[in-house]
Amino acid sequence: MEYKSTLNMTKSGFPMRAGLPKREPEMLKHWEELDLYNELLKKNEGKPLFNLHDGPPFSNGALHMGHALNKSIKDFITRSYAMRGYYTPYIPGWDNHGMPIESAIIKQNKLNHKAMSVAEFRSACHEFADHYIDVQRDGFKRMGVVGDWEHPYKTMDPGFEAQEVRVFGKMYQNGHIYKGLKPVYWCAHDETALAGAEIEYKDDPCTTVYVKFPMNDDLGKLSHLDRSKLFFVIWTTTIWTLPGNLAIALHPDESYAVVKAPNGEMYIMAEALIEKVMGIGGFDSYEVVEIHPGCFYENMLASHPFLPKTSRLVLADYVTMDSGTGCVHTAPGFGADDYETCKRYGMEMVVPVDDQGRHTDYAGKYAGMLTDESNSIILEDMKKDGTLFASEEIVHSYPHCWRCKNPIIFRATPQWFCSVDSFKDEAIAACNDVRWVPAWGKDRMRSMILERTDWCISRQRRWGLPIPVFYCKDCGKPICTPESIEAVATLFEKEGSNAWFDMAAEDILPKGFTCPHCGASAGFEKETDTLDGWFDSGSTHFAAMERDQGFWPSTMYMEGLDQYRGWFQSSLLVAVGALGRGAPFKECLTHGWTVDGEGKAMHKSLGNGMDPAEIFEKYGADLLRLWAGSSDYHVDVRCSDEIFKQLSQNYLKFRNTCKFCLDNLVNFDPNDLVKPEEMLPLDKWAVTRLNDLITKVFAWYDNYEFHSVSHAINDFCVVELSSFYFDILKDRLYCDEADGPERRSAQTALFLILDAMTRMFAPILAFTCDEVWLAMPHRAEDDGRNVLFNEMVQPYTQYALSQEEMENWGRIASLRSAVNGALEQARADKIIGKSLEAAVSLTVPQEDAFLTRMSEEALADLFIVSQVSLTVGDEVSVRVKAAAGVKCGRCWKVLHSVASVGEHEALCPRCAAVMAKLPKME
């Protein structure tokens, strides 16, 4: 007789094959119809606030894996807090101004931007930025990121621009903004100043030179020496800066020697570096004539090696003895330290390079040459005229523009600066009130602020927020008053910042406005520079978050490691310097870079990149989310097709676990769970293991350790459930009475496991967990519309086993491994086929004597054999033989109790009882 139809092998309709690329868009449509984001806010309104303020990506290209990692982690955070009872508004944002947008449209559209009017060019930039906002928004939505996508903030929106103008005004009135001539990073290709956060360092080959500066005036201190043969020797890696040399810096307390070479020339250099420098110069022998401290040479004059001018000997504590000659080439137009040193000595500022990176007339015969072009020519000229002491080829780390990738120069130009020194202590103190994840972020931020120089906030670009400063034509002084700032802000709110370029200064300023410096009532000009994009993004907490949401500070900022010198820092400086507040975030979390499978940076040119859009189509967004959720993102995160293939296997284990639960919960009513005292010990073991997982998952979500959540749930599915619990449970689920107490005990445990696991994994596997949620039965208090509307469950302590009982179950699991090993050997020896054909004789030591309290039938179920005999002895021993008896035609156990019952042949008592309650089979 065929008994298969009498087994409880129900099917839920939940498919084993995920088909995520096709299924996920359907889920997204369902979420949109549900108005998921707003419904979630309504549900949690009035609860504690968790506000993750979105760091705005540039709207200048399609999604890349860095975007995918970043937005996935943010979504994990907001979803996990929402499911733990928090109100979680999430307003995405975009950074729109600046060189990345300008460069992209010029390159893509081959625009002659210099021939375009400001209005035309800014319109093209605006259109370009809007397009990529749409592209990126569609990608983020496809990933399942929940947020207010219809109302994002944009740094180019009029309301934002107006608030940023007010931020600038506050910082100006606080005395932290000034205009000055100082060396800044300068990109000659793009003709603009750059911030430190816009610099990338690359290893470049370079020619370093040791140059002889003849003694000109020794102040009578070295008159006993032949001045015509006396030289200071300097060292530099930037030959093109030599025309700008005004001084030679020595350390006041270091010893400097006059070293005589065999050729009769005498060279002044640091005593500590004589052997190295003379060796580079090709001198095997030399004589140290005399030694003096660096301060001995102060205010002496040397002649420039190829220009008709002198260089003063000055003192500086920053001079080190680890490289060069100890005599430091000092050009105030090209270096911050150089500038400060020469300023201290009252020397003039000389900048012999123009905006395009060409030498000016000040450089003499090199005028008109690009700096790169002049290097080799100056070198050859010095070789010819004998001023070159030596040269070397080296590879050094040199700054490049982050956008055009060309080498940059350090060049003094008139710029607007934020004086960080004036509020540096307050900014550093503000770091103490932030939770940094990882914890070392605090020291990193504090040290960066401590070491930073003034912030250059002006840019010589057209696509940016105009610096809201006017100039009086009569007295020439800059004007930035509360009245002028509010006039500009009000104008921008109504018409946007393009109005600055379209209107005359008098039409922007209030009627009757007069110069606060000289009282002039007419003749004003507008500043032509725009603000640094980091000032834009650094103002988002005030110009977007506080303005639109009314929240300040945010609960969290979360971005990549590079933002310590970028968005984190600019936001902190704006908050302290402009608003007089502390940090604009309570927590600061960082992630690493995305790299390829070998740990290399991904670049189009290398062909090792991965496209999120292609991953959506091949694997589905949930696999992308699982990649982010399975990776320790505090370090660099690897991605490759092989990694995604492995993740697919992990995903299937979770999905199959859910399917097993769902299939066995058909017709189960979770409103009628068995009472704790009715649950069987094995089921309590499973729930207790679940409780342990729940406790750990809560802690991991608190610490943003999403990879721990993912790995633990995967291990729970594979080790505790599939390999142990489900394996043992199948007989009870399939063969017991459908509504019997033993099967309902198992179903109760399965429901608790599926319910808790689906909620716990929902922040990461958003699509799949919601698919499971829609397929599973629910309790009356559950919101069946979406898993996100339900909080994560607390441990089910009422069903938990004691610690002693759990230790006993640990011993059972160990014994089961021993039994399985013996069964495998018996199968290999042809003693048995399937494990139900086996009878096991098990000997256990005294510590396992608790097993004698269990029936041999229960032990047989645990080991998935037909018969077990148990004895207590000295050590574990397992013997396997073929079970004696008759095979039950329904459950396939081999038992002595199998017999014919009425019309049913060869049934065990359990199966016979079940059959007796079923309708009579035809």
Question: Where are the language model's segments positioned?
Answer:
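Alpha-helical recognition segments enriched in aromatics with Gly/Pro capping
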Residues: R312, Y345-G357, R461-W463, P482-D636
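Short cysteine-rich clusters marking metal-coordination/redox-active sites
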Residues: C187, C401, C472, C515-C518, ...
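Residue patterns forming the tRNA-binding/recognition surfaces of aminoacyl-tRNA synthetases
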Residues: E2-L20, E26, H30-L34, I106-P243, ...
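Acidic, turn-prone loop/beta-hairpin segments
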Residues: D95, V184, A188, L194-K202, ...
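Residues immediately within or flanking Cys/His clusters that coordinate Zn2+
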Residues: V184, Y398, I467-V469, G512, ...
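N-terminal catalytic cores of NTP/NDP-binding nucleotidyl/phosphoryl-transfer enzymes
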Residues: K42-S103, E164, I234-L242, V314-Y345, ...
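Cys/His-coordinated zinc-binding microdomains
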Residues: E191, Q460, G476, G519, ...
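Protease-associated
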Residues: A247, E254-C327, A336
